[in-house]
Curated annotation (Swiss-Prot):
InterPro entries: DapB_C, DapB_N, DapB_N_CS, DHDPR_bac, NAD(P)-bd_dom_sf. This is 4-hydroxy-tetrahydrodipicolinate reductase. It comes from Chromobacterium violaceum (strain ATCC 12472 / DSM 30191 / JCM 1249 / CCUG 213 / NBRC 12614 / NCIMB 9131 / NCTC 9757 / MK). Belongs to the DapB family. Catalyzes the conversion of 4-hydroxy-tetrahydrodipicolinate (HTPA) to tetrahydrodipicolinate. The gene is dapB. PANTHER family: 4-HYDROXY-TETRAHYDRODIPICOLINATE REDUCTASE 1, CHLOROPLASTIC-RELATED, DIHYDRODIPICOLINATE REDUCTASE.
Length: 267
């Protein structure tokens, strides 16, 4: 049976490719496409972003869209996602959350909501990125002495949070494998006379510019050699297809908090 899927942020960069991904996916049906009331796209066919007719017209009424919905896919902003999540909990509608930039309080709210509905919450829905997380765990356990860890990420000029959620997740995976607390060892950017590098540090460097979809590299640097594990995304479709896959996977999950490692069976 097809999953009735609601896309939030229909006119955004991710919303547009999510709509196309749902329209193309077997076992998925575009139930509603939601956008801001002032977006200028309300009332238009959601398929206009991919050059086809979908029969679903963009609306600003999120609550009405939940009637008959199975899953909401939300790649918007933290404050909006949390508001949508409350409505989903009240109506028993599952969620796929790709929004990044949540603070600790926001993440705690998601964990609490997952006690009532099924939620897939991930920093990145790309299959390749999630394989990269697995490789980083393996690498960190082997390169655990004498290797400095640095994470470099690049995104388009419009991205509003830094470092990216994916970069932070890479750091968490590596820190966990090394037995470190990322909150204690993370270094975000360097300037001026910094002194010698702390060998326990995990450094982050951020680049913003142009239309870069998403590049991430974890560098393990020792004296005499370095190992780099990289992922480069060339299309947002890879994230959208992963999110739709997650929505379909949620079909038999009444409640619980999951990520793409669960969806892909990588645990």
């Amino acid at each position: 049976m097809s999953q009735n899927i609601v896309i939030v942020g229909a006119s955004g960069r991710m919303g547009r490719v999510l709509i196309e991904a749902v329209l193309d996916a077997p076992g998925a049906r575009l139930h509603a496409a939601i956008d801001r009331a002032d977006s200028g796209f309300v009332g238009q066919d959601a398929g206009l972003f991919c050059g086809r007719s979908s029969g679903v017209f963009i609306s600003s009424d999120f609550i009405a869209a939940l009637d008959g919905a199975d899953v909401v896919i939300d790649f918007t902003r933290p404050e909006g996602t949390l508001e949508h999540m409350l409505a989903c909990v009240e109506r028993g509608v599952r969620m796929v959350i790709g929004t990044t930039g949540f603070d600790d309080e926001g993440k705690a709210a998601i964990r609490a909501a997952a006690g009532k509905i099924g939620i897939v919450f991930a920093s990145n829905f790309s299959v390749g990125v999630n394989l990269t997380f697995k490789l980083l765990d393996m690498a960190a356990r082997v390169l655990n002495e004498g290797y400095d860890v640095e994470i470099i990420e690049a995104h388009h000029r419009f991205k509003v949070d830094a470092p990216s959620g994916t970069a932070l997740r890479m750091g968490e995976v590596i820190a966990d494998a090394l037995g470190r607390d990322l909150k204690q060892c993370a270094v975000y950017g360097r300037e001026g006379v910094t002194g010698e590098r702390d060998p326990q540090a995990i450094g982050f460097a951020t680049v913003r510019g142009g239309d870069v979809v998403g590049d991430h590299t974890a560098l393990f640097a020792a004296l005499g050699e370095r190992v780099e594990i990289s992922h480069k995304a060339s299309s947002r479709a890879t994230f959208a297809n992963g999110a739709v896959r997650a929505a379909r996977w949620l079909s038999d999950k009444r409640n619980g908090l999951f990520d793409m490692q669960d969806v892909l069976g990588l645990r």
